[in-house]
């Protein structure tokens, strides 16, 4: 198939564009061994709010078919010609190894663009070699997303986690400052910085705050 036409979102928080897919349906790593959503995905922002609007949803559904075109990599490289920063997946994940391989090629062919890719697909063995190749590229930061919302991290990896409040930040974490900037990144580019090993996002949004509250109460009872 040819004639790929990738479509991009521009999250209000972000200083750049993003390429996204439908949340959860393209997130096989969002569930634990029992088939239940992990805490971080249970409170996912991309399943509510403006992400439910038809025009936003249709963009993600379009991309879910569009990446399968033979010329998708070429189309993405052309689109990123003027992008100095780019985020993959403000919604969804690289659920298919063929997609992951194509994303790697886009990254290789756009050395002028700094790519940030959050993912949970490291849980599956077949994705690990592709992720390792991405991590070798100087213009790419792959952040392995923690499943927890109480500050749990994936030790020894470039990662991100969710914390209940700023007081839960550990010394080895860099807290996302968007909560101090009306939800905006501002001039911060920590998520694209290989030297920043752990980014901690303060829980926000009704769904996530409820999830955090329930887990804290459970821990206190135990």
What are these regions (language model features)?
Residues 1-222:
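Class I S-adenosyl-L-methionine
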């Amino acid at each position: 198939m040819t004639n790929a036409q990738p479509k991009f979102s521009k999250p209000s928080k972000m200083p750049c564009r993003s390429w996204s897919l439908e949340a959860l349906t393209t997130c096989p790593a969002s569930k634990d061994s029992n088939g239940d959503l992990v805490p971080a995905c249970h409170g996912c922002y991309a399943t509510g709010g403006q992400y439910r609007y038809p025009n936003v949803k249709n963009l993600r559904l379009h991309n879910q078919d569009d990446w399968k075109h033979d010329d998708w990599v070429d189309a993405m490289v052309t689109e990123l010609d003027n992008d100095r920063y780019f985020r993959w997946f403000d919604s969804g994940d690289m659920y298919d190894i063929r997609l992951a391989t194509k994303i790697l090629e886009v990254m290789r062919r756009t050395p002028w663009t700094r790519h940030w890719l959050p993912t949970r697909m490291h849980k599956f063995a077949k994705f690990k070699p592709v992720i390792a190749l991405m991590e070798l590229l100087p213009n790419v930061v792959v952040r392995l997303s923690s499943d927890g919302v109480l500050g749990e991290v994936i030790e020894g990896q470039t990662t991100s986690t969710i914390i209940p409040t700023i007081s839960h930040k550990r010394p080895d974490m860099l807290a996302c400052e968007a909560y101090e900037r009306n939800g905006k990144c501002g001039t911060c580019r920590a998520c694209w910085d290989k030297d920043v090993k752990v980014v901690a996002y303060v829980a926000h949004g009704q769904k996530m705050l409820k999830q955090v509250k329930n887990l804290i109460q459970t821990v206190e009872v135990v």
